[in-house]
């Protein structure tokens, strides 16, 4: 997991700009690349997991085609490579984008080509990619792209956010900055799809989720586990133990500790400090439902205090397998997966966790597991994740199996009507003042 800026034919010096997102990397120094013939600049901070050797982890790699890779491809060895960086770049150069359907992980890849900078995002936008529409520039976060020129407030985006909590589109708070949709690439400002779910090969759900968990335990840094006491994280924890692996389970103190201790007594119970509205807006960089952002920020901060750079969670299961109450009334899966996840939940999780240099790994969001959910008829998904309960009942204590969903909340972090008005004012002052 890393951070980057890439640009072509601009007057900006990326050497100075990249330091504004230095928190996205750790354990390796910034390294830049400039191609004066093409007018290309690439800047990158690395958070290595696969190989901690600075000569291997720091990008751009001098031994590879000028490019930047952000994310993780967990099955790179299975695909015949020594690192996931080499896997992503060489797969693109030798086999093209269609070969990305073999990847298990999440990624953003930027490649310097004769036609221009190509920016590629993963199947669901787990690693968000942003670009400017008026200059050739891309980055891991939208805020840094404001430095390439004036920006105009997108009032439609803001109105949607105030109404729904997020904007279900590639728009951002600024008209000149957009997000690349999941499974798409951008070249010269033109965005095109490359991902086809029909090309994802999967087997049975239990096998594929187990494989996803095993893959996400990899790397040379310890991986922690967020154990909420709910169904999704309990399933993930159960598969970790079935694989014979040890993992540090962390529970956020929200009154659900008794359920988490039904899963394991070996638990770190942490209390979350409050997060100011101003900090939440500054970290998230765009207006959003801050009621969910604030506890996520507090959790990421606590993980770093405990010394972890990666955390495994049950994120994605609700959207995929009908975990929300609305799923019993109508089939919202498509909008939940392809609007709410890539344009609300995943950018929120990326920014809040990476601000504290923490990589989030969600086994439910592997391509194979997602395809299972997409192929499952509504009747089998309807009713509080019925398919998950039937498939993994042996891993889940009875009280958890039959309880209703509870969101991540704490007594210290709630949003009152008065606070919501403060949020609105803070958003305006921070973004458009």
Q: Where do the protein language model's features map onto the residues?
A:
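ATP-dependent adenylate-handling active sites, centered on carboxylate activation for C-N bond formation
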Residues: 8-10, 115-118, 198-395, 413
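PAPS-dependent sulfotransferase catalytic core
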Residues: 326, 396-432
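Polar, surface-exposed loop/tail segments
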Residues: 29, 33, 83, 385-391, ...
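Short clusters of hydrophobic/aromatic residues that line enzyme substrate/ligand-binding pockets
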Residues: 58-61, 177-180, 194, 288, ...
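Short amphipathic alpha-helical segments
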Residues: 15, 389, 429-430
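Short, hydrophobic/amphipathic alpha-helical patches that form generic packing surfaces
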Residues: 90-91, 159-165, 295-298, 425-433
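Cysteine-centered catalytic environments shared across enzyme families
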Residues: 1-270, 274-279, 283
């Amino acid at each position: 997991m890393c951070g980057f800026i890439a640009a072509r034919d601009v007057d900006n010096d990326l050497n100075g700009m990249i330091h504004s997102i230095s928190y996205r990397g750790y354990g390796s120094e910034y390294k830049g690349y400039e191609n004066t013939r093409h007018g290309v600049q690439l800047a990158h901070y690395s958070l290595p997991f696969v190989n901690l050797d600075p000569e291997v982890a720091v990008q751009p790699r001098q031994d590879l085609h000028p490019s930047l890779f952000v994310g993780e491809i967990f099955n790179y060895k299975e695909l015949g490579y020594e690192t996931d960086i080499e896997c992503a770049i060489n797969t693109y150069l030798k086999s093209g984008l269609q070969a990305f359907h073999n990847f298990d992980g999440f990624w953003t890849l930027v490649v310097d080509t004769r036609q221009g900078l190509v920016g590629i995002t993963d199947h669901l936008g787990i690693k968000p990619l942003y670009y400017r529409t008026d200059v050739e520039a891309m980055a891991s976060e939208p805020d840094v792209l404001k430095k390439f020129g004036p920006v105009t407030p997108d009032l439609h985006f803001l109105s949607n956010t105030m109404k729904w909590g997020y904007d279900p589109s590639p728009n951002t708070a600024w008209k000149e900055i957009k997000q690349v949709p999941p499974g798409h690439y951008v070249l010269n400002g033109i965005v095109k799809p490359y991902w086809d779910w029909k090309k994802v090969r999967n087997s049975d759900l239990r096998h594929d989720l187990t494989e996803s968990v095993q893959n996400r335990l990899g790397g040379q840094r310890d991986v922690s586990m967020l154990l909420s006491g709910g169904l999704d994280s309990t399933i993930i924890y159960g598969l970790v133990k079935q694989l014979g692996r040890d993992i540090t389970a962390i529970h956020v103190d929200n009154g659900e500790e008794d359920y988490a201790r039904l899963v394991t007594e070996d638990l770190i119970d942490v209390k979350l400090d409050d997060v100011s509205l101003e900090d939440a807006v500054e970290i998230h960089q765009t207006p959003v439902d801050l009621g969910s952002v604030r506890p996520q920020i507090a959790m990421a901060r606590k993980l770093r205090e405990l010394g972890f750079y990666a955390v495994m969670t049950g994120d994605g299961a609700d959207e995929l397998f009908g975990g929300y109450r609305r799923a019993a009334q109508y089939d919202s899966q498509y909008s939940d997966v392809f609007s709410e996840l890539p344009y609300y939940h995943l950018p929120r999780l990326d920014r809040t966790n990476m601000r504290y240099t923490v990589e989030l790994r969600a086994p439910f969001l592997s391509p194979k597991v997602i395809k299972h959910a997409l192929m499952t008829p509504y009747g089998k998904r309807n009713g509080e994740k019925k398919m998950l309960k039937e498939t993994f009942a042996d891993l889940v204590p009875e009280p958890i199996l039959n309880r209703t969903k509870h969101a991540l909340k704490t007594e210290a972090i709630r949003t009152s009507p008065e606070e919501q008005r403060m949020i609105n004012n803070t958003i305006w002052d921070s973004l458009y003042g």
